[in-house]
C-alpha cells in the first residue's frame, strides 16, 4: 500500500470513530460541563478569571487550584479562529478532543514509520485509530486533559524517531537537534493538564530502555542518544516549571494541597522548582538515570560479552531501584495517588478489570504478546518501544483511568505483533494458504476488532438529558445568583453549567452530601453551608450504592442495613410488573391499589405503597403486610423503587416521596427530578445602579470577606444588622465577596457573589 493511501485511511478512520458521538446534543460525562461553563464565562467577560462564584459552594472556586490555563485556552482560541466560518463555541469545544486525538494517531504512525517500516506503522496507527481505549477520551463531546498529554508524547516520540531514523551522512550528529522536540513537548504538556507527569516518566523510560538495548546489542553509539534524551527531560522540567509560573502548575504544585502533602511525605522543599514531581525528576531521577547510562558506557569498555553485560545490567538496575525507594519510601504509594484514592468510590480510580480491558481493546489486547516475536532478533528501536510499554502496562493494571494513556502501547504492540505473526507464518505457506492467512490475519482480524470498538463507541450516551436541562434552567430563572445548591456530586457540574449556581459537591465524592442524603446529617448541617435548594432525582436511586460507599468513608457512622433496588416496568397488561435483579413487583389497581413483591419464591407484602401519577404522590396502606418494606411506583415514567425501612427513612427517599418542612417542593417533573427550597433566613444579592445590596431577614450579624480575583483576601469585617432587612455592600477594591449571616451565634446562611471583574 502506498504511503499516501495508508495515512489517508488512518486519518479517515480516526476521524470517523471520534466523530460518532458528535451526533449527541449533550456532552458526555460530567467534567466537560465545568470546562465549558468556565470557557463561556471567560469568553463573555473578555478576560481570564480565577475566582468563580458559580462553583465550589459556598466558598467559590479558584481555577488556579485546578488545571493549568492551557486546558481552557485551546478550545477558546480555536473558537476565535473558527467563528469567522460560523462555528459556535460549543461546537468548537465538542470537536477539540477529536483534533488532538487524530493528531496523536497520525504522529504515532509517522513515528513508527521512521522506527520500523510501512506495514508496522500502518497497523500500529490503525489500531490506535480504532482503539476504544483511545477513542473514549479523544472523541467529540468529551473533553479531558489526558488527551493533550498523550498528544504531546506522540510529538516527543516523533522527535526521537527522527533522531534515531537518520543513520549516516551529514546529519549523523546534526540529527540530535530533533531531541528538542521531546524538550518542547514535555514542557508544553505541563500547561494543558494538571496530571501531565506520565510524559516525563515515558521519556525517561524510553531513554533507559534505549540504553539497555544499546548495551545488550553492543550498539554503544546509541548510548549517546540515551544521554541526550535524559537531558532533554531535564530541560523539559525547566520549561514546565517556567510555564507553570505563567499558566498554573500541575496537581503537585506548591500551592495545592496534594503538592504540599506529597512534598512533606517525600521530605522535599520547594525552591526554584515549584512542583513536587519536577523536583523529584530533576534532582533525583535524572542524575540516577545518567549514572546508570554512564555505568553502562564504562562496562562497555570493559567487556563485550553479552552474558556479563546482562548480569551487570541487572545488578545496576536493582541498585538504582533500591536507592530510589530507599530515599523516597512514600513512592510506594504512587499507584494510589499517595493514598488519596485508596477508598474513594470513583470508577476511574478502581483497579482495571478484564471487562474494562475487553471494552477498551477487545481482541487487540490478546495480540500484544506477539510483539515479543521481534526479540528473536531485537533492534534498539524495540527497546525504545519497551520504554513506553513497561510503564504503560503498570498504569493499565492500576486504574481504569489509565486505559486511555496505555492505549498507545497496546496499539503499538498489537499492530506490530500482527505483522510479526504474519511474517513468521508466511514462509511456511505458499499459494492459496499464504493468501488466506494474509486475509485472515491482516484484514479480517483487524476488521473484527474495528467492529467491536465501533459497537462500544455506539453504546455511549450522555448522562445529561432534557429533564435535567429543564429543571436546571428553571432553577437558574427562579433562584438568586448567590444561592447554594445541594445535590449528589455527579450532578454538580450540570448545576454549574445550566443553572450557573454554586453546588457544594462537584467533581469528586462528598462524604457530607452522602451522609446528608442518608439522613445522618440534618438540615442544620446544610443550612450552616448556606444551602438554599436541594435536588433529589430518580438518578440518585441508581447511584444509591455509590452513596452508601461514599458515606462509609466516614468513621463516625455505621452505614449498614440499607436495601434499595430500582425496578423498571416490564409489562403493563392486566397488572403492572416491575422487575430487576431477581425482584419482581406486581402492582394491581382494581378498586384499590395493592402490591406484592416476589423474591426467591417468597411473597413480600410492603408496609406501605406510594403511587405517583399526574396528580402527585398517593399513599396507600395495603390490606396486608408481612414486612418492613416499602414500594414506590411511578406511573409517569414507568419504574418502581423497592426498599427496606432503613432506606425509606433516608432524607433522599423522604424528600422524593413524602417531603416535610423545612423543605418546600418548588419544582417537579413528576418523577425524574425534584427541587426543594430549604426554608431558612436567606440572603439575596440585588444590584441597584452602582450598588450591591444584600436582602435578608432575621439576621443579627453579617460577615463579609473581600477577595481579589487571584484569591487574595483584602478585607474581612463583621457588621451588626439586627433589625435590618438589607445591607449596602461597601465599595472595596475587590472582585469577589463571601458572606456569612448569623442569628446570634448560629450561621443561618452563607455564600459568595461577584463584585466586579477587575
Curated annotation (Swiss-Prot):
Single annotated GO MF: oligosaccharyl transferase activity
Manganese in keyword set: yes
InterPro entries: Oligo_trans_STT3, STT3-PglB_core
Keyword Transmembrane: yes
Extracellular-facing ranges: 28-92, 142-145, 248-281, 332-352, 401, 455-758
Subcellular location: Cell membrane
Placement of sequence motif DXD motif 1: 29-31
EC number: 2.4.99.21
Region described as Interacts with target acceptor peptide in protein substrate: spans on this chain: 488-490
Cofactor(s) needed: Mn(2+); Mg(2+)
Cytoplasmic domain ranges by topology: 1-6, 114-120, 167-175, 218-226, 303-310, 374-379, 423-433
UniProt site positions, description: Important for catalytic activity: 137
Pathway info: Protein modification; protein glycosylation
Cellular component aspect of the GO annotation: plasma membrane
Any GO BP: protein glycosylation
Segments carrying motif DK motif: 540-547
Sites marked Interacts with target acceptor peptide in protein substrate: 31, 343, 543
Motif stretch (DXD motif 2): 144-146
Keywords carried by this UniProt record: Cell membrane, Glycosyltransferase, Magnesium, Manganese, Membrane, Metal-binding, Transferase, Transmembrane, Transmembrane helix
Function: Oligosaccharyl transferase (OST) that catalyzes the initial transfer of a defined glycan (ManNAcXyl(2)GlcAMan(2)GalNAc in Pyrococcus) from the lipid carrier dolichol-monophosphate to an asparagine residue within an Asn-X-Ser/Thr consensus motif in nascent polypeptide chains, the first step in protein N-glycosylation.
Family: Belongs to the STT3 family.
Protein's UniProt name: Dolichyl-phosphooligosaccharide-protein glycotransferase 2
Organism for this UniProt entry: Pyrococcus horikoshii (strain ATCC 700860 / DSM 12428 / JCM 9974 / NBRC 100139 / OT-3)
